[in-house]
Amino acid sequence: DLGWTVAPGRASANGLYKSSAEGLRSREVGETYAGIADTLAALFGNSFAFSEEVPFDDSLAHHLELDLGAGTRILNFGVPGYGVDQALLRFRKDGRSWAPRVAVLTFIQDDLFRVANVYTFFKVAWGIPLSKPRFVLRDGELLLLNSPTISPPEMFSRASVFDLPLLDLEIEFFPH
């Protein structure tokens, strides 16, 4: 469970974003990357990898394909709002099976803080009621918590925000 991801075979309401049959950013709705014989490279990360706010032909993945030339396809696994933790989980869940020759991780400073969040709605700029997986280090081992994630109905069925599980791991929550 990734918290949220790009749904397969969809287009945004304004038509700017489209996704492939596999849930990757693509030029056309529902196109498939399965069975392509080209050399594959994979792009993981946040809205910069996804190339939010720009059409496909201006996306990072498209420009990488142009720079690398014929015979190379970039699989765009980027998802807006992801931290490096979710990008790693997406690689494990969706990307590894493609056996890309190269995997590229994009990140910005804020992505490093996102690894310490469980709930997105504590970030003032978000306001979106989602939860995400969270890694913690225990006895020298990475342990994945909140997987599967808590759904919005589960979150808002609580009598108080203080009743949410894993609240002690939420760095954006500052009760007064």
Model-derived segments and spans:
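Membrane/wall-proximal cationic-aromatic binding patches
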Residues: 1-68, 171, 175-176
